[in-house]
């Protein structure tokens, strides 16, 4: 699991997962699906932090993340299929804070 640096509720950022260490020589990512859950805190709709679909480039899958609720930790679950028929999953936690919270 990856631990990403925090983001503010007001930010829109890209978060990438590097699958290159597990890919065989010549193997490429074919599809990517990203899911968001709340790892800590409460959010009735954690998938709302996902903006658009993941983008695949050079063995990495990247997802845009927006908003989120103050003091929650969101877990991104990125699952990719490959040209060799393999399926790999990476996860990463993103702490979210409000820039105006005291």
Which residues does each PLM region occupy?
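Predominantly extracytoplasmic/ectodomain segments of secreted and cell-surface proteins
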Residues: 1-27, 96-102
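Extracellular acidic loop/turn motifs
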Residues: 21-31, 40-45
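Low-complexity "stalk/linker" and mucin-like segments enriched in Ser/Thr/Pro/Ala/Gly
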Residues: 39-58
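Short strand-edge motifs at loop-to-beta-strand transitions and within beta-strands
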Residues: 59-63
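Surface-exposed, short loops/turns at beta-strand junctions within beta-sandwich domains
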Residues: 66-72
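Short, conserved beta-strand segments of beta-strand-rich sandwich/propeller modules, principally
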Residues: 73-77
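Beta-strand-rich extracellular modules
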Residues: 79-83
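C-terminal edge beta-strand
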Residues: 86-99
